[in-house]
Amino acid sequence: MTVTVEKGRTTESTRQLSVDDFLKMKKSLGLSVVQTKKLAGHIRAGTRNRKAVESGLAEALTERNNLLDDLFTSETVLVENKDGEGEEKTLIYCNDVSQLVLSLLESRGLEQTKTDAKLGLDKGRGSLKLTLSLMEKEERMKTGRQTYADGVGGKKHTSGSTYKLMVLALLYDTPETYETVKIMMEKLQFENFPATITSDIKMLLLLIGKSGGNLSHGCVFCDAAKPLDKEGTLYRLSDLHTWHMNYEEAGGDKKKQKDFQNIVNKPLLQMEPDDLILGAVAPPELHLMLGVGDKLKKILEKTVFETEKQGKEFIDDFLDNQNISKKGYMDSRSLEGNQTRRFLKATEELRDAYEEVGKLQKAEPVIQLLESFSVLVTKTFGFKLESGYEDAIAEFSSAYMKLNQEDPKTFTITPKIHIVMFHVTQYLQMLNAETGEERGLGYMSEQAFESVHSDMAQMWENGWKVSASHKDFGEKLRKFLVAYNSNNI
């Protein structure tokens, strides 16, 4: 519909903003219902025409916020705190995951056979969340700048992005433990639900039943033992259950857990006994990049100068000069995803900086590792694989192993480096075997649900927030999660 707007002596034709336009603006700008209504009012006033905005906006906003109301339940559950005492916590969860998936497929016009499901687990902003993404297998995204032809809020988001993500369960103000994850998984009843799981390494270890910390058998996917310099036998779900049963029958002594592959809890994965863990669980693209990048940065800090303090000061100055900010997910000196990528690409500048202080010769082997890993990330960690990715992995692995053999105490093989060396190629071959596609690690990346914490926090603060002591807190939190998910359909 076209609306005629008087402007002085001239007349201009302006497209009427539809209800759908406002729903898109509400989502893309992070507006509350009240703010969206105010925006519509300002547009009507500014154009001096009530018809500049399609009627029925208020009703549509309310309807959109409640589209999934019947599919989410609020419960109070008992969670053990650090002192071993039970505390009541609020859990919001989807009471019918299958129906939710069918609703999403219908709303998005997708066929189930042409989609992949991805589950994510992560704690952020005080709450433990379990998320679902439905991804189009043949999705091809338009690149380049948004144009006016795209319309209001016209930028299209990938099917696996934060803006299309569903939060299936939220456990408020709770620790990240085996028991809390178990509560959520059992409520959602995932049996026979075909989905790939990805998360950070700590969470993946919880899911397969391993204890936390510095483990003798720290790989999620195989039975390799420290120093993790060799490829182990890939786990099947039945292997994990057998190890756990043997651990329990031997008395369940955690001091002897290394004799049982560190499997101290029953695995929480719902899959066929003979299924491999690798494939059902995806190597976490983001956390592999963060972990390996941080490891190489710390080696530079510890080995190039006479003291680690000098090394840290040098790296801090270098990062500041490159406008690379610190404070990542691991500690106040670590880097987040984009910053890690910039650090990996800044090797020429890093060479120049070390050469200025006469330390390039000592730093050069690690700088070469950074370059090699940067090539690996470019070819492997994206949504689509680039040619030569297997060679890039092999070259990085060979270079790191050579330094490990020369100095095993410095160039230790962490679980993340082990996964990059031995399991990333295996996984990508599995991922693309049936379809012949060239999908990279980014296809099953955990980045979308890493971002969901800040996205939800913005909405929570913007008109939804109530105190946990509020008498109706559980229902308020449920309505919030329903609205968040309903606006992501």
Place the predicted regions along the sequence by residue.
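A structural signal for the principal folded core domain
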Residues: 1-489
